[in-house]
Every structure is written in structure tokens, then in C-alpha cells.
């Protein structure tokens, strides 16, 4: 039987294939999440910054109310945004996000970026992103909150024997480099369960992957299709690389296995125990994505795909104005 989940260092099982709700329109999120669960998805990956947590929770609750799944069958992820890194604000936002989803607890809560911005209350401006106004007339100042402070706040919310009412099951990070994780590792009482990173054949990051595996930190890959995830955002680097779906290497492997390019890209990750969270608005593609664990690539095929690595990163705050350097 194909492997469909991995065990986190927190003791919980995490599905290898999830449904990501980044860029899912708010008015379509509830139905999209419901449809994904009905098709067999058991992990939903969200974030406060995606602005659709309320609607995602509605889709989850509908699936539970209709008897499709039980709450304990699902693995729900959300993320702490940059304006809420101080201890009291991290706790405030984690509780807010749990309440917004309306499903009792979150299975995984991540620090979205190793970036601490000046606090902006949710009541003043929901979803402030990197700017304190929708016109983007000025950037939000950095706050320089130590990551250890933020982490300690999240630790206080984790369900444990001594904290049975904790609203988080596991905690982790996203977009963290090895050195920052090393610093966090030294002070953390609860070790990060997951690091969610940009990972695709054009950005393999083998040294970071090795570090995470050595430390027992699970890996979730976002933007598994590389440039495809950023076409609608008019990202300047998209036009400088071959779309992965049409790349000769990917096409040849897909044709050999009778699979789609998307399935090959997802299997390249999941076969190495890397969790994937693709998004699709198409039911057939949702089914295909979920089915990516039902075949295996050869070691040579995995290497061929990995050899496409050219260090191209699409999600980089250094591209902002002003730039924020977290990967240099």
C-alpha cells in the first residue's frame, strides 16, 4: 500500500498530500475545501494572511456535519503573520485564527516568515500584509522581535499532558534557513515539527533538506510547480525559465508513467517524504494530485528532476520595496 502520511516529531500523523488554499478566492473557499475533503483530502493548508480562514472553516464544518469525516480525521494548518511576533500578539493571533476556523483546534501552526513587523491590531486593519495601508504608500517598519519570544508564545498553546486545553497540536516554521533553526533549536522546549519551504526542481535546496532530515523536522513544499504558481502574479522570473509542465525532462518521465506533469512533480517530492499542498480549482486535477502517491519514480528519474536545480526562488521578500533579506 502506498505511503500516504508521515509521522511528525510531535507524534501526530501528517498527510503527504494536502489542499493548499493560498490564492483560493474568498467566495469560493468554503466550497473548494468541502469538495477537496469529499474527494479524499485530509489536510488543508491555510494561513491568516490568505484571508480565507473563516470560509475554509465553513467548508470543514460542512464536511463534518454531513458525516464525510470526523474532526480527528483532518489535519488543518494555519500560520502566524509577521505583525504578530511579540509574545502577547502571537498568542492573540493564534487564538483568533483558531476561533476563525471554528473547528476547536489547529493541528499545525507555523511562523509564516522569519520577519517581525510592527504590530497592527486586527480590529484596525485586518490582513495588513507588508503594508499598513491598502494603497501600499509606505512599508510597515520592522519590529525586531526575537524568534525565541514568538516561539515561546506558541509553545504555551500546545496541547500537552500539563496543558490539556492547548489549542495547537503541533507547531513549526516556514521559510526558515538552517542557521536560524539552529538558534531556535537551542532554546526551544518543543522542537519545530515542520518547516514549510519553497521547493521545486528549480529550487531544490539539498543542504537545507539534509539539515531538516538530520534534525527530525518534517518538510512541507509549497509552489511545487515552480513558476506556474506565480504566473498570475506577473513575477519577473517566471518568463526566464521553462514552465515545468512542458519541460522535456518532466514530459518524458510523465509520458513513460502515463501520468501528468503535475503528478510527476508531486511524486518527486512525496517519494522523498516531503509533504505537498497543491491548489487547483479543477476537480479532475484535484483527483490527479491526490493520486500522486500511487506510482513510483526510479532513482534515476528522481535525480534527473533534481538536476534541474538552478537556484531560482520565486517567493522572496527581497523583491519587495524596500527589500527584506531573509535568504541571503
From Swiss-Prot:
What EC number is given for this enzyme? 1.1.1.-
Q: Name the family the entry cites.
A: Belongs to the aldo/keto reductase family.
- What the protein does? Pentose reductase with a broad substrate affinity involved in pentose catabolism. Has highest reductase activities with L-arabinose and D-xylose as substrates, and displays much lower activities with D-ribose, D-galactose and D-glucose. Has highest dehydrogenase activity with L-arabitol as substrate, followed by xylitol and D-sorbitol. May be responsible for the first step of the L-arabinose catabolic pathway.
Active-site residues?
50 (proton donor)
Give the transmembrane region(s). Answer: none
Induction record: Overexpressed during growth on both D-xylose or L-arabinose compared to D-glucose. Significantly expressed during late stages of infection of barley leaves.
Q: Could you confirm whether the keyword RNA-binding appears in this record? A: no
Q: Which residues form the signal peptide?
A: none
Q: Which GO terms describe its molecular function?
A: aldo-keto reductase (NADPH) activity
Q: Which residues bind substrate?
A: 112
Q: Name one Pfam family in it.
A: Aldo_ket_red
Which residues make up the binding site for NAD(+)?
Answer: 174-175, 223-232, 279-289
Q: Which InterPro entries match?
A: AKR, NADP_OxRdtase_dom, NADP_OxRdtase_dom_sf
The name this protein goes by in its record: NAD(P)H-dependent pentose reductase
> Where in the chain is the site Lowers pKa of active site Tyr?
79
Its keywords, alphabetically, are:
Carbohydrate metabolism, NAD, NADP, Oxidoreductase
